[in-house]
A protein has these predicted regions:
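Short, structured coil segments at secondary-structure junctions
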Residues: 30, 71, 129-130
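Short, well-structured N-terminal submotif of metal-dependent ribonuclease cores
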Residues: 1-40, 49-66, 139
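Acidic, PIN/NYN-like endoribonuclease modules and their adjacent C-terminal/linker elements
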Residues: 1, 108-139
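Active-site neighborhoods of divalent-metal-dependent phosphate/nucleic-acid chemistry enzymes
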Residues: 46-54, 70-117
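Short secondary-structure boundary/capping segments
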Residues: 1, 24-28, 66-67, 75, ...
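A generic structural signal for short hydrophobic patches within well-formed alpha-helices
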Residues: 10, 41-44, 83, 126
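Residues that scaffold the ATP/ADP-binding catalytic core of kinase and kinase-like folds
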Residues: 12-13, 25, 47, 86-89, ...
Length: 139
């Protein structure tokens, strides 16, 4: 299955003891079938930038650098096609009374535009966008 990893998936994998179901799923996947949105990279970088200078911030910054290198060629940008798709799915979610944050909408639009399934624990955040979903914590 070709998946776009939501930020919560990537963040969970940094924990000393990540969720066992997620860890098993991630280990069983072919790395070339896993993608990141540029939005996820931004969310991770924002999180590290918010930390006070010190060892934890330095370690997480180094990890983020390594993540970007390991997903080289598989970090999908928000281009005009993704932005247009976001406008469509965000408007649909708003019409149904379920507006969602911009970042989630852009991640969903990226997945739709590239024919990917969003891997996330936060299924409720993505359902209004009509994107294919997979919860590696539960499925």
């Amino acid at each position: 299955m070709r998946c776009l990893l939501d930020t919560c998936v990537v963040s969970e994998l940094t924990k000393p003891k990540p969720n066992p179901e997620l860890a098993r799923w991630f280990a069983s996947e072919h790395v070339e079938d896993l993608y990141l949105s540029a939005i996820t990279i931004g969310e991770i970088r924002r999180g590290t930038a918010q930390l006070a200078p010190g060892r934890r911030r330095a370690a997480l910054t180094a990890w983020a650098d390594k993540l970007s290198r390991s997903f080289s060629g598989r970090i999908l940008p928000v281009d005009e096609a993704v932005a247009t798709r976001w406008a469509e799915i965000a408007a649909s979610a708003e019409r149904s009374g379920k507006p969602k944050p911009l970042a989630d909408g852009l991640i969903a639009a990226t997945a739709v535009q590239h024919g990917l399934t969003v891997a996330t624990r936060n299924v409720d955040d993505f359902e209004p966008f009509g994107v294919m979903l997979f919860n590696p914590w539960a499925d």
